[in-house]
């Protein structure tokens, strides 16, 4: 005789919580599975995406005390004129380089930090 889903649910509904826990353990052993709750894949997917990132934005977050040196570094990295570079530095946070490789982004970050700026890679 085969039980229907309704009959199984009705039988489980008549059991105590302790009996249901024992039933779950027995089913795990019998079928070689675990009854762990499914975990949302959001954080894992985000972490994988962060590892696969190939393009970076270099963001000047703060000019620091050595503003003149930072302006020179921005000019060197971007090819901007003095006025445009000063406007970028004065308007921090500003994107200095967009869609560059990891190596280029790290080099730009290093140059800007050596000049006295605070920089983030995004």
Curated annotation (Swiss-Prot):
Q: Name one GO biological process term.
A: translation
The answer, when asked if Ribonucleoprotein is one of the entry's keywords, is yes
* CC annotations in GO: cytosolic large ribosomal subunit
Q: Which domain of life is it from?
A: Bacteria
Q: Name one Pfam family in it.
A: Ribosomal_L12
Q: Which UniProt keywords apply?
A: Ribonucleoprotein, Ribosomal protein
Q: Please list the GO terms describing molecular function.
A: mRNA binding; structural constituent of ribosome
NCBIfam families in alphabetical order: L12 (TIGR00855)
Tell me, how does this one assemble?
Homodimer. Part of the ribosomal stalk of the 50S ribosomal subunit. Forms a multimeric L10(L12)X complex, where L10 forms an elongated spine to which 2 to 4 L12 dimers bind in a sequential fashion. Binds GTP-bound translation factors.
PANTHER family from the xrefs?
39S RIBOSOMAL PROTEIN L12 (PTHR45987), LARGE RIBOSOMAL SUBUNIT PROTEIN BL12M (PTHR45987:SF4)
| Biological role | Forms part of the ribosomal stalk which helps the ribosome interact with GTP-bound translation factors. Is thus essential for accurate translation.
The UniProt family comment states: Belongs to the bacterial ribosomal protein bL12 family.
Name of the molecule in the record: Large ribosomal subunit protein bL12
Native species: Pseudomonas entomophila (strain L48)
